[in-house]
């Protein structure tokens, strides 16, 4: 009668690992052979069963598998075949079934550790031989494994006995698909090969007897597919269960096999012995190495030496090889790589690089780098001017004016003088008849300052009571410390141009103030308005709203414009302002 492992240890099925350990120690002290000298044989068998039960239950995986198959293991009788739906299957087809194999998961069957018929070696060995025979027969049905004789070994066990059959086939490893379990004198290395092979067991059985439905040709296509699907599912489940059961049985027998424990112990002792011998040899060499220093000298082997006469030949070969490599490299030529450091790209040809330079991506990256460099220069104080350099400064305008074509300059001056002469002749008798205003426009790098003079009729001026000027200026932001410098440079340029003696048809030179801000004239009794800041070209002592007229050449002041014009006419102090472009820029008022 089989005994449950939990009952054998005296614990509940939900006992913890600590409770199992305490129960095993208690049972071991009770049934250990040393504690029972009067009944050693019975105590040994009982103690072996207790130890096997504890080894199974102490392993979580083994315990889970035992709990799921406990009823089948404890059942001594094979499964009943009296069911209505069950049918008898030939044993040669099924071989050892899963249910039959579960009957041997009983440690009480392996209490005798000897070579007898009731011992563990013959019981377990015959089971493994039967399993190997089933696999060979299944393989031969599939047209495989014709060279293996595992089925012959099982037949020899029945005819000549297990021990003699093992002796006949133990050395025929090439004729056996699965190694033999052997018996007590079997080598430890052979046993390791046995357990390694059987631990990777995978059956070749078809398990067709596990089909749930009988296949018939009369079924329609849909029914056939469904029947095949369900039958294949049942076969696969049975196949997986069989493989797991065989692997569990291998682990179960390995725990009971003393040969593995003794062999591992002997192998460890041999390893330690060899390690100790190696250490002793090293110590002896170190100890006696100094005494035999003169006698035991290191000598090069014949294959480690090179004859002197061969050195010259080797050097010649090396020199020739170097010349050959150099000539080869010269033939190959240099490989040029074209690289754009801005975009971090490489090109194989110069044409590709040029095409890349014309792309929008390269230009965009180039502009970003230029802006970053400008910002860094301003931050570090490396530039004398700020971002206002993008606009026309006084220095730039002077340099640009020096490069202007003389003919274009003369034509512009003649046009300005003609307009000034006409406006002065019409309104010379009255001060309010002339409304000449000048405006300065600060444009982009390519533009210069622009002068525009508009006149309005007297009737229109009386009606509106205010002169309206249609010129707009662009306000320039500049540093205070550069205003005087730019004004002086512009005055010098105007003076130099005036000295050339350019005159109109009436021999009169008229000069207009180059940089005077125009604005609306305020009415009487009206609120004061904010005046526009004066530009850098005006004298620093003169405000934009002052009524005093000043000669830009000699600096003399006059109360009215007529006096200023008479002075310019007599003294010839006409200052000329060149106009290259006429571009109106709207000014946004903030």
Curated annotation (Swiss-Prot):
Locations of Basic and acidic residues compositional bias? 269-284, 480-489
Tell me the GO molecular function terms: ATPase activator activity; zinc ion binding
Q: Which SMART domains match?
A: DnaJ (SM00271), ZnF_C2H2 (SM00355)
Chain positions of all zinc fingers (C2H2-type): 338-362, 549-573
Statement: the UniProt record of this protein carries the keyword Nucleus? yes
The residue ranges flagged as biased composition, category Basic residues, are 455-467, 513-527
* Pfam families, sorted: DnaJ, zf-C2H2_jaz, ZUO1-like_ZHD
Give all Phosphoserine modified positions: 393
Organism's domain of life? Eukaryota
Protein name per the record: J protein JJJ1
Underlying gene: JJJ1
């Amino acid at each position: 009668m089989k005994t449950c492992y939990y009952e054998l240890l005296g614990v509940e099925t939900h006992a913890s690992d600590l409770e199992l350990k305490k129960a095993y120690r208690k049972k071991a002290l009770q049934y250990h052979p040393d504690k029972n000298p009067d009944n050693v044989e019975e105590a040994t068998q009982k103690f072996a069963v207790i130890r096997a039960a504890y080894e199974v239950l102490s392993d979580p995986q083994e315990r889970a598998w035992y709990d799921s198959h406990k009823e089948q293991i404890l059942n001594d009788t094979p499964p009943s075949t009296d069911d209505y739906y069950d049918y008898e299957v030939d044993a040669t087809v099924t071989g050892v079934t899963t249910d039959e194999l579960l009957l041997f998961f009983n440690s009480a069957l392996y209490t005798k550790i000897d070579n007898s018929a009731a011992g563990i070696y013959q019981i377990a060995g015959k089971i493994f031989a039967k399993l190997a025979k089933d696999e060979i027969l299944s393989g031969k049905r599939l047209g495989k494994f014709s060279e293996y004789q595992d089925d012959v070994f099982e037949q020899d066990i029945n005819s000549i006995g297990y021990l003699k059959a093992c002796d006949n086939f133990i050395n025929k490893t090439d004729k056996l698909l699965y190694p033999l379990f052997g018996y007590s004198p079997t080598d430890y290395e052979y046993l390791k090969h046995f357990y390694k092979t059987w631990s990777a067991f995978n059956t070749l059985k078809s398990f067709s007897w596990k089909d749930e439905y009988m296949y018939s040709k009369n079924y329609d296509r849909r029914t056939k597919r469904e029947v095949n699907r369900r039958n294949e599912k049942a076969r696969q489940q049975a196949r997986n269960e069989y493989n797991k059961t065989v692997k569990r049985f291998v682990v179960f027998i390995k725990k009971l096999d003393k040969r593995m424990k003794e062999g591992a112990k002997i192998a460890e002792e041999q390893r330690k012995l060899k390690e100790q011998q190696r250490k002793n040899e090293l110590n002896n060499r170190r100890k006696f190495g100094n005494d035999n220093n003169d006698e035991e000298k290191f000598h090069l082997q014949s294959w480690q030496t090179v004859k002197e006469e061969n050195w010259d030949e080797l050097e010649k070969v090396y020199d020739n090889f170097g010349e050959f490599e150099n000539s080869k490299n010269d033939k190959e030529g240099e490989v040029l790589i074209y690289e754009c450091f801005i975009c971090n790209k490489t090109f194989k040809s110069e044409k590709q690089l040029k095409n890349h330079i014309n792309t929008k991506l390269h230009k965009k990256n180039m502009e970003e780098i230029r802006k970053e460099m400008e910002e860094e220069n301003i931050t570090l104080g490396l530039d004398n001017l700020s971002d206002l350099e993008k606009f026309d400064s006084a220095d730039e305008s002077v340099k640009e004016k020096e490069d202007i074509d003389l003919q274009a300059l003369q034509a512009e001056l003649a046009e300005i003088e003609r307009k000034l002469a006409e406006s002065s002749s019409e309104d010379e008798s009255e001060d309010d008849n002339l409304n000449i205003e000048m405006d300065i426009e600060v444009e982009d790098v390519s533009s210069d300052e622009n002068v525009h003079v508009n006149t309005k009729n007297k009737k229109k001026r009386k009606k509106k009571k205010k002169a309206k000027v249609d010129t707009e200026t662009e306000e320039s932001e500049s540093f205070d410390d550069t205003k005087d410098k730019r004004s002086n440079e512009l005055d010098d340029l105007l003076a130099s141009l005036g000295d050339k003696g350019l005159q109109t048809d009436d021999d009169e030179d008229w000069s207009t103030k180059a940089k005077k801000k125009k604005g609306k004239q305020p009415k009487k009794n009206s609120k004061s308005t904010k005046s526009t800041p004066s530009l850098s070209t005006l004298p620093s002592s003169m405000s934009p709203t002052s009524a005093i007229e000043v000669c830009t050449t000699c600096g003399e002041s006059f109360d009215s414009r007529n006096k200023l014009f008479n002075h310019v006419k007599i003294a010839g102090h006409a200052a000329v302002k060149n106009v290259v472009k006429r571009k109106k820029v709207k000014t946004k008022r903030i």
